[in-house]
């Protein structure tokens, strides 16, 4: 499960950490996707809510991924569930206009 933390971006906001867990301890920066309550219904959004540790229904915005210093990460507040990983993969593929064939 991918962790959700509070991070200092334009303001303190929840983010989903996208960087692989196995390499995180060795890095000074991580790639994150911000989480927002502004839902646009885009194919690049992944719905998240209380089951993920959030106070209100929100979306992971894969159009706005960014790499930030690890020191900008605050406390962990939740996780993306394993069952939500396929939606995340699809949203990232849409955000970067990737074409792939799933075997």
Curated annotation (Swiss-Prot):
Activity control note: Digests 23S rRNA in the absence of Mg(2+), increasing Mg(2+) concentrations decrease its efficiency.
Expression induction or repression: Mildly induced (5 to 9-fold) by starvation, when grown in a non-replicating state, in the presence of isoniazid, gentamycin or rifampicin.
Enzyme class: hydrolase
Outcome of gene disruption: Individual deletion of mazF3, mazF6 and mazF9 have little to no phenotype, but a triple mutant shows increased sensitivity to oxidative and antibiotic stress and starvation, decreased formation of persisters cells, and a decreased bacterial load and pathogenic damage in infected guinea pigs.
Pfam families registered for this protein in UniProt: PemK_toxin
UniProt cross-references to SUPFAM superfamilies, sorted A to Z: Cell growth inhibitor/plasmid maintenance toxic component
Molecular function in Gene Ontology: DNA binding; RNA endonuclease activity
InterPro entries membership: PemK-like, Plasmid_toxin/cell-grow_inhib
GO terms classed as biological process: mRNA catabolic process; negative regulation of DNA-templated transcription; negative regulation of growth; negative regulation of translation; positive regulation of growth; rRNA catabolic process; symbiont-mediated perturbation of host process
Highest taxon in the source lineage: Bacteria
Record-listed E.C. numbers: 3.1.-.-
Alphabetical UniProt keywords: Endonuclease, Hydrolase, Nuclease, Toxin-antitoxin system
Gene3D superfamilies: 2.30.30.110
Subunit structure, as described in the record: Forms a complex with cognate antitoxin MazE3, possibly with 1:1 stoichiometry.
Family, per entry: Belongs to the PemK/MazF family.
Function: Toxic component of a type II toxin-antitoxin (TA) system. Acts as an mRNA and 23S rRNA interferase, cleaving predominantly after the first 2 Us in the sequence 5'-UUCCU-3'; in 23S rRNA only cleaves once in the ribosomal A site in dissociated but not intact ribosomes. Cleavage of 23S rRNA inhibits protein translation; the 23S rRNA region cleaved is involved in tRNA-binding in the A site, 30S and 50S subunit interaction and ribosome recycling factor association. Upon expression in E.coli and M.smegmatis inhibits cell growth and colony formation.
Name of the protein described by the UniProt record: Endoribonuclease MazF3
Species of provenance: Mycobacterium tuberculosis (strain ATCC 25618 / H37Rv)
